[in-house]
């Protein structure tokens, strides 16, 4: 998505607060966001690290960013962990979601 708007002059000093209020991204959590974030925290037994976070750059005027929906992370011991996910809804079919996940991770892993 491309988002445009008018920002106050002091917006650079507020970028951290802005990102904190926007993350995790709604495309990751679904809705209603507060409840889905709670469910994710209860269900997952690990810290996501950078996965589903945001990366990008800010040149003082322009901000380009992306949500890390597929991410390869090197652990302190040198092992690498590939993280990926998918959106589950009440209409999701477990078998189809599993097959889609295999397709998403196939290229980076093989």
What spans do the regions from the language model cover?
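Conserved hydrophobic core element of enzyme catalytic domains
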Residues: 2-110
